[in-house]
UniProtKB/Swiss-Prot annotation:
The keyword Cell division applies. SUPFAM superfamilies: Cell division protein MinE topological specificity domain (SSF55229). Pfam families: MinE. It comes from Syntrophobacter fumaroxidans (strain DSM 10017 / MPOB). InterPro entries: MinE, MinE_sf. The gene is minE. Coiled coil: none annotated. This is Cell division topological specificity factor. Gene3D superfamilies: Cell division topological specificity factor MinE (3.30.1070.10). Belongs to the MinE family. Prevents the cell division inhibition by proteins MinC and MinD at internal division sites while permitting inhibition at polar sites. This ensures cell division at the proper site by restricting the formation of a division septum at the midpoint of the long axis of the cell. One of its GO terms (biological process) is cell division.
Length: 92
């Protein structure tokens, strides 16, 4: 039964998952993005988006994806609600 479900929905082989992880590590390395820089980027994105929306700060993911001709910064953030008016910018 489990085999049929996996065949129907598909399952990534552990080799594919490991390959994707290695690609992400290599992208970070090529761009010279240290874990500290990625964390700072995550925190900055969190601060800006928090002015406009209530979000689950524990759920934010920031990744780099690379296609044949591009590199993209992709974030996944759970939004709890959108504010009617933006919060004031506290950086000034």
């Amino acid at each position: 039964m489990l085999k049929a479900i996996r065949r129907f929905f598909g399952e990534k082989a552990s080799g594919q998952v490991a390959r994707r992880r290695m690609q992400v590590v290599l992208m970070h390395d090529r761009m010279d993005l240290t874990p500290d820089i990625m964390e700072a980027l995550r925190n900055d994105i969190l601060a800006v988006i928090s002015r406009y929306m209530e979000i689950d700060s524990r759920s934010i993911r920031v990744d780099l994806e690379q296609g044949k001709e591009y590199m993209a910064l992709v974030s996944n953030i759970q939004i709890k609600r959108v504010y009617r008016k933006a919060a004031p910018d506290i950086r000034s």
